[in-house]
């Protein structure tokens, strides 16, 4: 009875979607979990951030018909793949983590493109049906989001095109640099040595050797 009472208070304050999402976020469904509402604010902030992809703080509608770029497509298709697999194994908590990561990425990219938002809404609807039903209608649909086709991910959008290397001098990390995923060691070495950020660490010193750990690290040994 106490838990039901607390639940009704949460619904009144945060809404039913926040409660649903929070309960699924607590951990694997097969495990018993103590009732704890300490993290519910974070879940509510996520939903507000998600809403922020559709409307700004002045309540201006943001969704556009623009074509998404590679980074935006990668973010949403990575999400679709993760959630599709997680739902099959009832791993709802990790799905919600994936939603949070995706929304953070799209917020950073300032992405409010309908084709991207539609797919997220369709994926999120089983978790938060009320807000998703409203957003689905705002995106121009006359039917319920419950009748929407489940999005399909495309592996082509998930391919890594570049790799982020940590550049170190005598074992101490100094900066990071992106390289095409197919860049060879000679190209990587030449570009790092020519990078203006390397100058102050190499000034007055001699290169003994360059160690390249594929897709991870470049260490320039100096004396």
Language-model features: locations:
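Cysteine/selenocysteine-centered motifs that mediate thiol-based redox chemistry or coordinate metal-sulfur cofactors
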Residues: 200-223
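Short, small-residue-biased leader/transition segments that mark boundaries at the very start
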Residues: 1-4
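A short, contiguous, amphipathic alpha-helix enriched in charged residues
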Residues: 182-202
């Amino acid at each position: 009875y106490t838990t039901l009472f607390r639940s009704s208070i949460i619904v009144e304050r945060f809404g039913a979607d926040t409660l649903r999402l929070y309960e699924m976020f607590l951990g694997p469904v097969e495990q018993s979990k103590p009732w704890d509402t300490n993290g519910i604010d974070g879940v509510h902030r996520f939903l507000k951030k998600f809403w922020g992809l559709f409307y700004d703080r002045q309540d201006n509608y943001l969704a556009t018909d623009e074509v998404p770029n590679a980074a935006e497509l990668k973010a949403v298709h990575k999400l679709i793949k993760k959630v599709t697999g997680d739902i099959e194994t009832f791993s709802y908590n990790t799905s919600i983590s994936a939603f949070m990561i995706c929304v953070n990425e799209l917020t950073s990219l300032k992405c409010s493109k309908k084709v991207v938002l539609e797919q997220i809404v369709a994926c999120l609807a089983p978790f938060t049906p009320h807000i998703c039903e409203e957003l689905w209608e705002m995106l121009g649909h006359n039917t319920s989001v419950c009748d929407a086709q489940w999005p399909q991910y495309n592996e082509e959008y998930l391919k890594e095109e570049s790799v982020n290397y940590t550049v170190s001098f005598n074992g101490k990390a100094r900066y990071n640099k992106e390289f095409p995923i197919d860049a060879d060691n000679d190209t990587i070495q030449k570009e790092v040595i020519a990078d203006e950020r390397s100058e102050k660490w190499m000034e007055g010193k001699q290169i003994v050797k360059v160690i390249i750990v594929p897709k991870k690290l470049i260490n320039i040994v100096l004396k």
